Amino acid sequence: MGLSSAAAGEGPQLCVFDLRRGQQEGQELDKILFFHPTDCPILLQLSVIGLCEGIITFARIFSPDDDCEVIESEKHSHVFYQAEADIWMVLVVEKNKDIESTWRCGALQGILKEVHSLFTMFHGPIRTLLDRQPSAELARGHLRTFFTDYLSDFNAGKKIQLPTFRDCLKERGTVQMLTISREVALEVQSLTTVLGSCLGNVMCQSLVLFEDLLVSTTLPPDDTLNLYTYAILRLTPRALLSNATSWSYLRKGTSVHAGPTSSSSNGTASVERPLQREKLYKGKDGFVAAGSTTSEVRGAVAWVPILWFQQAEDRMHLCVYQHKNITILLLIPASSLINGDDGIAHVKRHLLENASQNIVTLELKLSRGWGGENAYHVGGYRYLLVDPDRKVSRASPPGKVTTLSKDSLLSLNRLREEIDLEKSRAKRSDSCHDKDFEVCIRAKNNAWVIAKVTRGRELYMALEKAGETLLYASTAIEKFSNRYCEGAFSTD
């Protein structure tokens, strides 16, 4: 496996390739759709992908019905994800003796799943792009700019910093919900009804966020997750503030080049690079706008991208409105928007005229009842709750997780790795039934690290300065489950 890692010392390698392409001798380069780093020598790219293809083929001999997920060698980990039929994504990361670089392969695979889901939401399936233009230049162009902009979030100086053991109490690929009272729920329902009628008889869909938490959605779970993920990355007030910081930094002389950005024929901002951080900001009217490359002369232009959803039958225009800590993501069926920009303007007017008071009232009530960044802190516990079926999670605030010792975090990260393996084995042996697990490990510094999986729901926690008996750990789980999980993890 040495060939795959000749240049890995420069950082992780991420590649996307199509096994249906480049099958003839001399055409191997045709199967490469994306490779990071982009300046990696072609021969090295071919050797990495050739090795990955060999591993996939070899694994299928022994397990034809299950995809290869991870291959560990002495110096590297290869994390695989078959994003679409015969279209593979592989992340190659170098192992080293630096404990700070310790990762969990399940978390790395989560990155591959996330970027593919986001890409598909904006550009459609990769296979569709390849069928539309068999030369693959269209697909390669979109993949290059989109993946480059996505990976920029992991930049640490000149290198990419992937999630490490310090992120073991986070779960990528889930939504974090805001808990609301019955009174507030009625306000949310009223607002959702108004948003749904923004286009008259045609029903619009919507997501409502408060800060970085989901308040309501009218979309199915998979589509909700993808749009929520994008909102957290680029659209919430916190994300837009980060966008502005990035833009200021770039204006001072540092630039990132990943390909051209164009404008569409109707004057709206191009969505060729929806993850380009410095382009988006909140306009004076409250709607998110895009600054053009000549914004000093022309000003901002409308930003209404078209999205592809997995479970919706129609493509949707996305319109984003903000009021203080509230973010409204309004989705308008593309087939129902006959007049283009005029139709979008009509929807915006309807929102401002009919929903403004609802939004102001809801924001006030949510702000009054909001406990701040530590709202979901539970004294004595550092925890992560995951419901994979609903794609929902809740976790201790990041600031509280940082108080855990390195040993506790490393122990919990290793435990999560073991649970990932057990879940994978259980799924292969019986995909129709969830297997329950409970593991309590005594770690250093009088700590317990705990994992419990019950009826598909998962609980991970670390308890420091804790009693040394197993009864102490079991009692702590029971108390937490009964008070915060409606008894979902209780033994009774």
UniProtKB/Swiss-Prot annotation:
Q: Which organism is it from?
A: Oryza sativa subsp. japonica
Which InterPro entries would you find in this protein's record? Answer: Ccz1, CCZ1/INTU/HSP4_longin_1
Record protein name field: Vacuolar fusion protein CCZ1 homolog
Ranges where the record places region Disordered? 255-275
What does the UniProt function comment say about this protein?
Answer: Plays an important role in membrane trafficking through the secretory apparatus. In complex with MON1, acts as a guanine exchange factor (GEF) for Rab7 protein family. Promotes the exchange of GDP to GTP, converting it from an inactive GDP-bound form into an active GTP-bound form. The active form is involved in protein trafficking from prevacuolar compartments (PVCs) to vacuoles. May serve as a linker between Rab5 and Rab7 protein families in PVCs and mediate PVC maturation.
The record's family statement is:
Belongs to the CCZ1 family.
Q: How does it assemble?
A: Interacts with MON1.
The lineage's top-level taxon is Eukaryota
**Would the keyword Protease turn up in this protein's UniProt record?**
no
Record's Pfam families? Answer: Intu_longin_1
User: Can you cite a GO biological process for this protein?
Assistant: vesicle-mediated transport
Give GO cellular component annotations, separated by semicolons: intracellular membrane-bounded organelle; Mon1-Ccz1 complex
Q: Where in the cell is it found?
A: Endosome; Prevacuolar compartment
Which keywords does the record carry? Endosome, Guanine-nucleotide releasing factor
> Mainly resides where?
other
- Answer whether the UniProt record assigns the keyword ATP-binding to this protein: no
Q: Which GO terms describe its molecular function?
A: guanyl-nucleotide exchange factor activity
Comp. bias (Polar residues): 260-269
